[in-house]
Amino acid sequence: MSELARFFIELGEKWQKRWAEARVYEPAPTLGVPKFFITAAYPYPNGAIHIGHGRTYLIADVLARFHRHLGRAVLFPMAFHYTGTPILTIAEAIAAGDETVVEEYMAIYGVPEEEMRKMGDPLYLARYFHEQSKRAMQKFGLSIDWTREFTTIDPEYQRFIQWQFEKLRKKGLIVRGRHPVGWCPRHSMPVGAHDTKDDKEPDIGEWTLIYFADRDGLIFPAATLRPETVLGVTNMWINPEGEYVVAEYDGRKMVLSRDAAYRLSFQGSVKVLREAKGREFVGREVQNPVTGEWVPIYGAKFVDPKVGTGVVMSVPAHAPYDYAALRDIGAIRLIPLIKVEGYGEYPAKDVVERMEIKSQTDPALEEATKEVYSAEYARGVMREDVVELVGRHLPEPARSMVMAVFKMYFAGRPVREAREFISKWLAEAGLGGVMYDIMNKPVYCRCGTEIVVKVLEDQWFINYGEPRWKELAKKLVEEMTIVPPEAKAQFFATIDWLDKRACARTRGLGTPLPWSHGWVIESLSDSTIYMAYYAVIKGIRRHNLRPEQLTEEFWDYVFLGVGTPEEVSAKTGIPAEALRAIREEFEFWYPLDSRNSGKDLIPNHLTFFIFNHVAIFPREKWPRQIVANGWVLREGEKMSKSKRNVLPLDKAVEMYGPDPLRATLAISAEVEQDLDFRHAEAVRNAQQLMSIYTLAQRLAQSAEDREPTWLDRWLLSEVALALERVRDAYEKVRVRQAAVELLYNIKNIFDSYMTAVERPSRLAVEVAKAWAVALEPIAPHLAEEVWSLLGGEGFVTSAKWPQLKPDPAALLARRYVDMVVEDVKKIPAYGEGVRRVVLYINPNFTWVKAALNNDVKSAIAAGTPPQLAKRLVELVRTLGDEVRSLIAAVENFDEREALLSYKNYVEKALGAPVEVYTAEDPAAPDLGGKKKAALPLKPGIFIER
């Protein structure tokens, strides 16, 4: 541990103890006081929280602390998510003696060997990391109200979740039925993002299976995402070296890759009859079930047996890979199906030739495929003459009937409509089917098993596909603030594709499903409205309510205002006054003002949060804001246990101290960006914070009582402007922007001031105290120390936001002085050996104000000599918007007073003594005839060497 880190750790411990003793972060509802209620995602205690969690919690804490300075009652609570399989899976691995897991936990999290032996018990493991994570949050300086802490397996919480689920069921939003889900074969249970390694959400997609059959009736099911192109098939592909099987699948005998047979076994009945190499089937002919044409099966090593069924249909007119492969073997036959503006009859051929692709192994084929598929899906229309390809093997009138159907629903239709039609038609005609797959595979369960798709028959689902519910969810997204704003599109997209989602399991920790024995509500379903529970749990404990008293009537009254306290009291035995108090506390805190989490939770938790709020609460209780931050890398690499580069939050605090760590997580990237945490940056920020502390010490020791000078007023004004920018940044959740202003820009302003004055003034101390208030959300421990050092009363965490007002004249004075220094340095005579600089000022500021409108006549009318008016107007025109606006805001400006105030500063900048005269003063010497050169804001300059 470095001395710098030790200093900040001790500072943190000092102020954390004082905050806890004063209970400053335990707010009570206060009539007439505005509130701000913010939450961040509660962690799974299956391991210690790391700096990625720390970033999310820091952003929430910054907002919480900022809103306290605005005079609001701020509630920032925290809890722990015990539900589901993450804890159970790790505990099982430890109990089974999994050396990798044991080694990781000892190396990364520093778990002692004697503790590891106890962690085969999932509840022991959860409580261990629960307490470790809580300590880390406290050491990190989070302003959390710990009186509302809970776990998701507390009996009171379980009653709350059961109430929520009964509400959803009564609204028809929980259903039971057949649906594909991500599935862990080892544990025989559905999985979501929080059950997988790296929290990867299984993306379930749908292949259309098209049944091509050989002359013996053996089916070769081609798996495709583009079933509308089946009319253009000229051959089939199979990997000759691949492992295949002949199997019975749902009563049909077919050829599948061995991997596909395994995956399909979770979706239907699969009976493997025999195994075979792919080469056995190369050379056979199969019949296209739509056109009746017989096409050959070719061998191709590019076919991946793990994708789809391992049987691929070839459409060279519209698939660049197929075109290139068939060109290589000299077997191209093209059947045009889709018209796309900007392409000829054969889009695949056009793109392959335009991109000069030489063979089927050319990497550019990937880009070519994306281009063709995207263009055809977005703008493509099926050709009218494709009808002639349909049903050539069928007798009349069957063929005419099928052609009529295709003419009506397929020919001339946009590709997306044709695709939907033919998928349904193939299934209904018994010529095809559906295969579900993990499209972003491989995805692994936390136990290490690869996830598959299983079609469940009697599973409980939350039906996020319900159209009216989707519309309500979209309405909330439209109304609420989303940070970053561009994430709104992702929320809308997620709402569109969400469908039924398995909400209960037969395994894991959590809340029992109230109406179906043996089912446990899963972790992404019991964590959607728990923010409301924070608002009432303190009251539940204060009034010593028992879990069995927390009935439907209790929750209906507290959250929805159904019934009266007296009616609910009669049914629950809870005193009416207690009910009224709990209801009033909920009414005070809700709705939630900000929900903070990582951007990876947009496709699941954050969208479920939206859905469940609109389903259960009235509109006035819908949440107001979501903040979704980017990921955290470490030294340019993704953190992972396998790389041993995960940095637990408590270790990071020990390495750098809380405030340097907070500053680094705040300043290294804007909220929506991924943040690369670097050691060198953390050390640099620690040094910068230390320099702020040293500055505060100097101010406390050397400040003097005196009338404020131009320099003092400039300091106040510059910091006032900076604090306006900081406030705007905080309000817009631009945390990095605020941190840059606070740690570096304002420090530079103070450094410039301290260089220019012999001793700082008491006004400078007051300005530094204002800085400490604004700095507090990012570096609260240092801010408290600075505030205390400078004589601030109470805690800075409770101080009101500073009300500094910039003085335009003081700002103009500094801009003017810097312009003069720059003008002197541009003169050829300036350089080494200068003995003195003499400045002649023209005191007629009214001329400058008249010149602002860029009109020479106006300047002359204001008294400007005609021979100077044009020069003055041109000068003012070049000053820039900021200086011009300051001139407009200032009634009168004394250049001589400004220069004399900044005399030390100017002399240091020029490296020579400086004398200042008024050009109109007849007693002043006219050195070099420079008096007549003086214009307002542009002195005459004489340099003596």
Curated annotation (Swiss-Prot):
A motif ('KMSKS' region) lies at residues 638-642. It comes from the Archaea. A motif ('HIGH' region) lies at residues 43-53. Its EC number is 6.1.1.4. GO terms for cellular component: cytoplasm. GO terms for biological process: leucyl-tRNA aminoacylation. It catalyses: tRNA(Leu) + L-leucine + ATP = L-leucyl-tRNA(Leu) + AMP + diphosphate. It is found in: Cytoplasm. PANTHER family: LEUCINE--TRNA LIGASE, CYTOPLASMIC (PTHR45794:SF1), LEUCYL-TRNA SYNTHETASE (PTHR45794). This is Leucine--tRNA ligase. It comes from Pyrobaculum arsenaticum (strain DSM 13514 / JCM 11321 / PZ6). The gene is leuS.
